[in-house]
């Protein structure tokens, strides 16, 4: 679970990176589709899945918007992400293991954009936050 300190670190760091959230999201989704090509199966309806393409940019922005909502409701992530959990579980049928894959890619992308600010302390808190976010997204799978 997230400590009070973790929550403060995540909120502080997120406020710093939110200005580049669309770019970070685009990079993270592009990275996921490249490094884990099996994830492309969920996006077969897109005209293209290459990094930087319009669908990747749009989805990256959408994901980072949802994460921003989760940061703002850090004490109720399951509530903040309930409709997304429902969508991914029951309509899109996304394997919840992919949430952890995306979290890993997102941390790599954040580090590319903010190498100095992404200290070990920030890394630890963001990792814990993203793991809690993945659990919240998997909530409706039960």
Curated annotation (Swiss-Prot):
Keyword Metal-binding recorded: yes
Modified residues (N-acetylserine): 1
GO biological process: one example: hydrogen peroxide catabolic process
Keywords linked to the UniProt accession: Acetylation, Heme, Iron, Metal-binding, Oxygen transport, Transport
Residues binding heme b, per UniProt: 88
Family annotation (InterPro entries): Globin (IPR000971), Globin-like_sf (IPR009050), Globin/Proto (IPR012292), Hemoglobin_a-typ (IPR002338), Hemoglobin_oxygen_transport (IPR050056), Hemoglobin_pi (IPR002339)
UniProt: O2 binding residues: 59
Pfam families in the record: Globin (PF00042)
GO cellular component, one term: hemoglobin complex
Tissue specificity remark: Red blood cells.
Domain (Globin) ranges: 1-142
Note: This fish has two hemoglobins: cathodic and anodic. Cathodic Hb has high oxygen affinity, low cooperativity and displays a small reverse Bohr effect. Anodic Hb has low oxygen affinity and cooperativity and displays a normal Bohr effect.
Role according to the record: Involved in oxygen transport from gills to the various peripheral tissues.
Assembly and binders: Heterotetramer of two alpha chains and two beta chains.
Listed name of the protein: Hemoglobin anodic subunit alpha
Phylogenetic placement of the source organism: Eukaryota, Metazoa, Chordata, Craniata, Vertebrata
């Amino acid at each position: 679970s997230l400590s009070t300190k973790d929550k403060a670190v995540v909120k502080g760091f997120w406020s710093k990176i939110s200005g580049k959230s669309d770019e970070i999201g685009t990079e993270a989704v592009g990275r996921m589709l490249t490094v884990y090509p099996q994830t492309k199966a969920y996006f077969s309806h897109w005209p293209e899945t290459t990094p930087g393409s319009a669908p990747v940019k749009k989805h990256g922005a959408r994901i980072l918007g949802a994460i921003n909502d989760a940061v703002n409701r850090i004490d109720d992530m399951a509530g903040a992400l309930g409709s997304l959990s429902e969508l991914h579980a029951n309509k899109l049928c996304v394997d919840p293991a992919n949430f952890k894959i995306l979290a890993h890619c997102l941390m790599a992308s954040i580090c590319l954009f903010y190498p100095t600010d992404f200290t070990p302390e920030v890394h630890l808190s963001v990792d814990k936050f993203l793991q809690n976010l993945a659990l919240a997204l998997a909530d409706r799978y039960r």
